[in-house]
């Protein structure tokens, strides 16, 4: 940074502190990742200066010839990556992508089937504190109480009973493969639209390591960060028959001017995801997650559903008589960042929780491999079994430093 230190030393110092935090800590939050320098350069470019209401070739402002090029690049790369007929890359977030789909096919009060938040769903899948739960009549489905895998018979039964206009598949804390073909079969049976929110698994889908929802869903929404390793933002993929409606729902429906610097960064990230080395990266994410799952089980921890098929795992801390809130705090104190998370049928509130959610996308980007997963599991075991033992916690801090120093992040 050449100008910020002199122009605004307070902001510069805070950014520098955050850079040091990211370098010094082991990042295990499943929704986070580290973007490339190229993505950051695009997001910090002169594209941030340009207003571009509308779509390429149909703008409400002049001077859009170059932002048109970059948005077309992003759209075409998204379509190529996921095999979609249409892509809208303007949503500012995954939540707004979901909102646009709802506005396209629903009216206030319509019935929607969505996954229970405490079973792994998302706020925008019908939580009563979210616009989705306020505007629409969401009926919840969940996971089997024994296996903690989606109960497709329950989904079918509720679909038949409530006849939803839309079924929402996808999750924010579900460690197993989702059967999109089964969801489409159920949707067709009751005459519902199917929307898949693949925000967490988009990078794995792009690499061919998780079933692709695009052939099955009428609409697919996603974020562009998480496993896709792009800038924070959203995206919608849909069939061509819905393209005009979706585009209209985004602009002028719920957004004004698109963030062209973010769209430029999305284009870069989507280009990266089309490369062969991204497939290698995505495979390593899953390998690391499964190795970490096995190592945590050896440490005596209980995993929701018994393991993982993707990038994340949920640890049930009730056998350790710990809450997610306590675990998150003590792990952060030694340099391991996780988030407290509800588990299926959780007796605790969302502010306390009985579990933690762990993901491997960020540490895999950093270069961590299977041996490092064993060390992370050992560290988590050491800390959570000795939360009041300062000597053990200090040992963990030193081991975290040793590990992070081996894999420098944004140091040049």
Curated annotation (Swiss-Prot):
Signal peptide as annotated in the record: none
Catalytic activity, EC: 2.1.2.1
Site positions per UniProt: Plays an important role in substrate specificity: 225
InterPro entries reported for this sequence: PyrdxlP-dep_Trfase, PyrdxlP-dep_Trfase_major, PyrdxlP-dep_Trfase_small, Ser_HO-MeTrfase, Ser_HO-MeTrfase-like, Ser_HO-MeTrfase_PLP_BS, SHMT-like_dom
GO terms of molecular function: glycine hydroxymethyltransferase activity; pyridoxal phosphate binding
Subcellular localization: Cytoplasm
UniProt cross-references to Gene3D superfamilies, sorted A to Z: Aspartate Aminotransferase, domain 1 (3.90.1150.10), Type I PLP-dependent aspartate aminotransferase-like (Major domain) (3.40.640.10)
Annotated PROSITE patterns: SHMT (PS00096)
Record-listed (6S)-5,6,7,8-tetrahydrofolate binding positions: 117, 121-123, 349-351
UniProt keyword list: Amino-acid biosynthesis, Cytoplasm, One-carbon metabolism, Pyridoxal phosphate, Transferase
Main location: cytoplasm
Annotated Pfam families: SHMT
Annotated metabolic or biological route of this protein: One-carbon metabolism; tetrahydrofolate interconversion; Amino-acid biosynthesis; glycine biosynthesis; glycine from L-serine: step 1/1
Cofactor(s) needed for function: pyridoxal 5'-phosphate
GO cellular component terms, semicolon-separated: cytosol
NCBIfam families the record matches: PRK00011.1
Function, as annotated: Catalyzes the reversible interconversion of serine and glycine with tetrahydrofolate (THF) serving as the one-carbon carrier. This reaction serves as the major source of one-carbon groups required for the biosynthesis of purines, thymidylate, methionine, and other important biomolecules. Also exhibits THF-independent aldolase activity toward beta-hydroxyamino acids, producing glycine and aldehydes, via a retro-aldol mechanism.
Assembly behavior: Homodimer.
Family classification: Belongs to the SHMT family.
Protein name as annotated: Serine hydroxymethyltransferase
Organism: Geobacillus thermodenitrificans (strain NG80-2)
Name of encoding gene: glyA
């Amino acid at each position: 940074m050449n100008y910020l230190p002199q122009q605004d030393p307070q902001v510069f110092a805070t950014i520098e502190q955050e850079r040091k935090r990211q370098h010094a800590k082991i990042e295990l939050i499943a929704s986070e990742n580290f973007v490339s320098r190229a993505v950051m350069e695009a997001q910090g470019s002169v594209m941030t200066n340009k207003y571009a209401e509308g779509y390429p070739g149909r703008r409400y402002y002049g001077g859009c010839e170059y932002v048109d090029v970059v948005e077309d690049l992003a759209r075409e790369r998204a379509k190529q990556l996921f095999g979609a007929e249409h892509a809208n890359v303007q949503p500012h977030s995954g939540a707004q992508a979901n909102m646009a789909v709802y506005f396209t096919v629903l009216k206030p009060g319509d019935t929607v089937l969505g996954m229970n938040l405490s079973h792994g769903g998302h706020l925008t899948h019908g939580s009563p504190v979210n616009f989705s739960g306020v505007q629409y009549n969401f009926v919840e489905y969940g996971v089997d109480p024994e296996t903690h895998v989606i109960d497709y018979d329950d989904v079918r039964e509720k679909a038949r009973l409530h006849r939803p206009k839309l079924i929402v598949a996808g999750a924010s804390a579900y460690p197993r493969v989702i059967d999109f073909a089964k969801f489409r079969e159920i949707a067709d049976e009751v005459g519902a639209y199917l929307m898949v929110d693949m925000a967490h698994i988009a990078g794995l889908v792009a690499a061919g390591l998780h079933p692709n929802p695009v052939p099955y869903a009428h609409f697919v929404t996603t974020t562009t960060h998480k496993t896709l390793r792009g800038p924070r933002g959203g995206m919608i993929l849909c069939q061509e028959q819905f393209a005009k409606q979706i585009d209209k729902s985004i602009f002028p429906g719920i957004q004004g001017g698109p963030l062209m610097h973010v769209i430029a960064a999305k284009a870069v990230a989507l280009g990266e995801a089309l490369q062969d080395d991204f497939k290698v990266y995505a495979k390593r994410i899953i390998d690391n997650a499964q190795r970490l799952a096995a190592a945590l089980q050896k440490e005596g921890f209980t995993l929701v559903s018994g393991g993982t098929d993707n990038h994340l795992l949920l640890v049930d801390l009730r056998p350790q008589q710990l809450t997610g809130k306590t675990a998150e705090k003590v792990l952060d104190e030694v340099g391991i960042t996780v988030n407290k998370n509800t588990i299926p049928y959780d007796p605790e509130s969302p502010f306390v929780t009985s579990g933690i959610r762990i993901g491997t996308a960020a540490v895999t980007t950093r270069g961590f491999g299977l041996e490092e997963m064993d060390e992370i599991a050992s560290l988590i075991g050491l800390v959570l079994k000795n939360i009041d033992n300062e000597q053990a916690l200090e040992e963990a801090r030193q081991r975290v430093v040793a590990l992070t120093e081996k894999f420098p992040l944004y140091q040049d």
